[in-house]
UniProtKB/Swiss-Prot annotation:
It comes from Mus musculus. Highly expressed in cochlea. Residues 1-18 form the signal peptide. GO terms for biological process: cartilage condensation. GO terms for cellular component: extracellular region; Golgi apparatus. Disulfide bonds join C32-C37, C55-C127. InterPro entries: OTOR (IPR042801), Otoraplin_SH3 (IPR035554), SH3-like_dom_sf (IPR036028), SH3_domain (IPR001452). SUPFAM superfamilies: SH3-domain. Residues 39-110 form the SH3 domain. The keyword Secreted applies. This is Otoraplin. The gene is Otor. The lineage of its organism: Eukaryota, Metazoa, Chordata, Craniata, Vertebrata. Keywords: Disulfide bond, Secreted, SH3 domain, Signal. Pfam families: SH3_2.
Length: 128
């Protein structure tokens, strides 16, 4: 009986680990360079370290370059967050996309202006 219980619990852990979680929205709108929000807006450099509080965010180290893909529209006194990715040491090594506070970085180069205001969706705040 104990063996069956252990197998069931192990299966439950595997099942839960294979599914993501929809987290609370940080904003209902975002600014992007294009309608699909896939083009890079800018390249920014981190001015200080940042430890991600949950899976929606990314860890950033001072001096790292971050490619910015969207900028959340600030609502109800919330902080301003941008979505971006820190790339690895190798050119083809793409990092995980996540949010970080905009006041943490300084934009180094703007590729395209973020002029398209798009509603955020649940998938924008999905965590695996």
């Amino acid at each position: 009986m104990a063996r069956i219980l252990i197998l069931l619990l192990g299966g439950l852990v595997v099942l839960c680990a294979g599914h993501g979680v929809f987290m609370d929205k940080l904003s209902s709108k975002k600014l992007c360079a294009d309608e699909e929000c896939v083009y890079t807006i800018s390249l920014a450099r981190a001015q200080e370290d940042y430890n991600a509080p949950d899976c929606r965010f990314i860890d950033v180290k001072k001096g790292q370059q971050i490619y910015v893909y969207s900028k959340l529209v600030t609502e109800n006194g919330a902080g301003e967050f941008w979505a971006g990715s820190v790339y690895g040491d190798h050119q083809d090594e793409m990092g995980i996309v996540g949010y970080f506070p905009s006041n943490l970085v300084k934009e180094q180069r703007v590729y395209q202006e973020a002029t398209k205001e798009i509603p955020t969706t649940d998938i924008d705040f999905f965590c695996e």
